[in-house]
Amino acid sequence: MSIASVASVFKGEHAVGSKVTVRGWVRTRRDSKAGISFLAVYDGSCFNPIQGVVPNSLENYDNEVLKLTAGCSVVMTGDVVESPGAGQAFELQVTELEVTGWVDDPDTYPMAAKRHSIEHLRELAHLRPRTNIIGAVARVRNCLSQAIHRFYHEEGFIWVSTPLITASDCEGAGEMFRVSTLDMENLPRTSEGKVDYDKDFFGKEAFLTVSGQLNGETYACALSKIYTFGPTFRAENSNTSRHLAEFWMVEPEVAFATLSDIAGLAEAMLKYAFNAVLTERMDDLQFFAQHVDKTVIERLQSFVSSDFAQVDYTDAVDILQKCGKTFEFPVSWGIDLSSEHERYLAEEHFKAPVVVKNYPKDIKAFYMRLNEDGKTVAAMDVLAPGIGEIIGGSQREERLDVLDMRLAEMDLNKEDYWWYRDLRRYGTVPHAGFGLGFERLVSYVTGVSNIRDVIPFPRAPRTANF
């Protein structure tokens, strides 16, 4: 006898007639007049539960099996048999069943068989992994994460763990969470009346990071090809379906690389990850296609078979101005393209993923390489049909004098970036990288439109439960 996951049984890894033990939770129980109960038991290893056929000859049939309800945890031992019913190839003829955990009050169990709205499930984030939709999201999220790590490993990249606590504002936007151990009721003050951060834990102001990029660049300028994959934080007071205060970012950084190089890297990475989901998690994708967004499978298949289009920002603006479509936000050179503009380009004009590049410098960060025209920077966004921007990246400014000029233009103190400037003083090289918002990727793959439903415990304005 062996411990078996539900997924391993369905994959045929246990011969018909072999005895296995499956451990999981009851989804439903159905009793027949013939004295047999049918238990649907799931363990999270795949989308479908396994059916346990439980005869009334079991010693605990009357006093336990017939009292099982949704959510009870069980250990079932039995023989693997071919299932005569439709929908699954194998089931379990149960010879022994142990109840390891009861649901105290089945009438008040929040995850009972009735269907809940996705909004209601957010209030029950500690129990929502037990539902079909959130369980499927979790498996797809894991598949994407593993695929991304695998992709970079196969491409010879080194994973770098960048710090979550920082003194630098990567984006220069100022929307950062402060990290402090000072007594909020009795703050130390300087002679000018300002908060004296010399008395704080780090002896200076410290924040939660908005990006691992700047730290990642230091390792790329020594190890050539690196990537970071970790949580980032934005204190942006946005209560929308597209924003989180805490989210995960994938940020590769490549020495001796140009904007064109990382555009190619972005395309290869996305196609690799999407192929992994199509190969490994089709059961979950079929659920999303049936209940969330009927286009998810077709969209991913189309994505991996499409060549990425490329267009300069200036040309993209021209396309938008001449398309004859009325946008909510008017288009003019110098604006940051909104979601409606991005989606028009990807879905209606190019009908494919598209890389928009060479943006106006005034709407981009200080570290992006200034182009020869003095007006634009070597920046790019990857736009995907169905969602818009999914990746943002750039070639970094490797020239110290130009970097200092950009810091001054954005009213940033270059002394705060002394270590970042050192990279340009000691063996500077052209280098480039991008950032992928991981939750936005999961949203795109699953069709689950609210980003708060694709991360286990969402953090947003006024939302920090669990």
Swiss-Prot record:
Record key words, sorted: Aminoacyl-tRNA synthetase, ATP-binding, Cytoplasm, Ligase, Nucleotide-binding, Protein biosynthesis
Q: Which domain of life is it from?
A: Bacteria
Q: What is its main location?
A: cytoplasm
Q: GO terms for biological process?
A: asparaginyl-tRNA aminoacylation
GO CC terms of this entry:
cytoplasm
Q: Which GO terms describe its molecular function?
A: asparagine-tRNA ligase activity; ATP binding; nucleic acid binding
Q: What is its EC number?
A: 6.1.1.22
Please verify whether the record's keywords include Ligase. yes
State the compartments where it is located: Cytoplasm
Reactions it catalyzes: tRNA(Asn) + L-asparagine + ATP = L-asparaginyl-tRNA(Asn) + AMP + diphosphate + H(+)
Q: Which Gene3D superfamilies match?
A: Bira Bifunctional Protein, Domain 2, Nucleic acid-binding proteins
Which InterPro entries does the record associate with it? Aa-tRNA-synt_II (IPR004364), aa-tRNA-synth_II (IPR006195), aa-tRNA-synth_II/BPL/LPL (IPR045864), Asn-tRNA-ligase (IPR004522), Asp/Asn-tRNA-synth_IIb (IPR002312), NA-bd_OB-fold (IPR012340), NA-bd_OB_tRNA (IPR004365)
Tagged with keyword Disulfide bond: no
PANTHER family to which the protein is assigned, alphabetical: ASPARAGINE--TRNA LIGASE, MITOCHONDRIAL-RELATED, ASPARTYL/LYSYL-TRNA SYNTHETASE
Say which family it is in. Answer: Belongs to the class-II aminoacyl-tRNA synthetase family.
Name of the protein described by the UniProt record: Asparagine--tRNA ligase
**Gene source species:** Shewanella sp. (strain W3-18-1)
State which gene encodes it: asnS
